[in-house]
A protein has these predicted regions:
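Non-catalytic interaction/clamp surfaces of large macromolecular machines
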Residues: 16-18, 23-59
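Phosphate-handling DNA/RNA-contact segment within nucleic-acid enzymes
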Residues: 1, 13-20, 24-28, 69-209
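Conserved small/polar residues in nucleotide/adenosyl-binding loops
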Residues: 216-220
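Short, well-structured beta-strand/strand-turn elements
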Residues: 51-64, 182-192
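Acidic, proline/serine/threonine- and glycine-rich low-complexity intrinsically disordered segments
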Residues: 4-5, 212
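Active-site-adjacent loops and short helices of periplasmic peptidoglycan-processing enzymes
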Residues: 6-11
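Conserved short loop/turn motifs at secondary-structure junctions
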Residues: 13, 33-37, 61-66, 215
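Structured loop/turn residues at secondary-structure junctions
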Residues: 191, 214-215
């Protein structure tokens, strides 16, 4: 009985921790979206509009913008009652040695990444300034986010796959640009190659996906 009780307690503890991570990511998503549509987000919004995206599409995918300051998101989440450890555990910030906690994403167009329950679990960020490192980065991996086990837009594409096969494309903007033109059955990996876990997800949803030649090399 003691073992059963311990297992139950561990399950409850893990469930509560994961729910907190999901809630933090949802709060971050709202913050990024609000910031994109503020006066400070005009350059990023123009970038997305110049890429041909409609305002409706931008809102549908909950695209956002991270501030250029190093603690914009941190301060917002703290004001909602989350502490620094919570924010770091959610993969949204990191702490350099002997320095304060800093936002992981700075001055980036933000792409929310959702699980099959349609909950935001992480973000991809596209840099608007080359001085902020790599062109694209993702949230750090967490208890609710493993980069090689998810696909961008899978939940939405799953609905369309009843009539059309899944189409695997390269990245976030490819998926969103297709959706902007009423093609809703596209998904994208969260890195440069498809993993076996991602392929299993694809085949679970669609028996005959359209797989580009560039993705026929799989990561072991």
């Amino acid at each position: 009985m003691q073992i059963t009780t311990n297992c139950l307690n561990q399950y409850i503890k893990s469930f509560i921790q994961k729910q907190k991570l999901l809630n933090i990511n949802e709060a971050a998503c709202k913050f990024f979206t609000k910031y994109l549509f503020s006066t400070k987000g005009s350059m990023a919004l123009n970038y997305l509009r110049d890429r041909g995206l409609s305002i409706d599409t931008i809102k549908e995918f909950k695209l956002g913008l991270s501030p250029s300051k190093s603690d914009g998101l941190i301060n917002s989440l703290k004001s909602e009652g989350y502490n620094e450890q919570d924010i770091e555990n959610a993969g949204l910030a990191y702490k350099p040695e002997n320095k304060p906690l800093v936002d992981r994403f700075k001055n980036r167009v933000m792409f929310p990444i959702s699980n099959l329950d349609n909950r935001v679990v992480a973000f991809g960020g596209r840099s608007l300034n080359t001085s902020y490192g790599a062109k694209y980065i993702n949230s750090a991996e967490t208890k609710v986010f493993k980069k090689g086990s998810l696909l961008f837009n899978l939940k939405r594409a799953q609905k369309s796959s009843k009539n059309d096969p899944l189409v695997i494309v390269e990245g976030y903007m490819d998926v969103i640009s297709l959706a902007n033109n009423s093609i809703n059955n596209a998904v994208a990996p969260l890195g440069t190659s498809l993993t076996k876990e991602q392929l299993q997800l694809i085949w679970r949803v669609c028996e005959e996906p359209i797989l580009p030649v560039s993705y026929t090399h799989l990561r072991a």
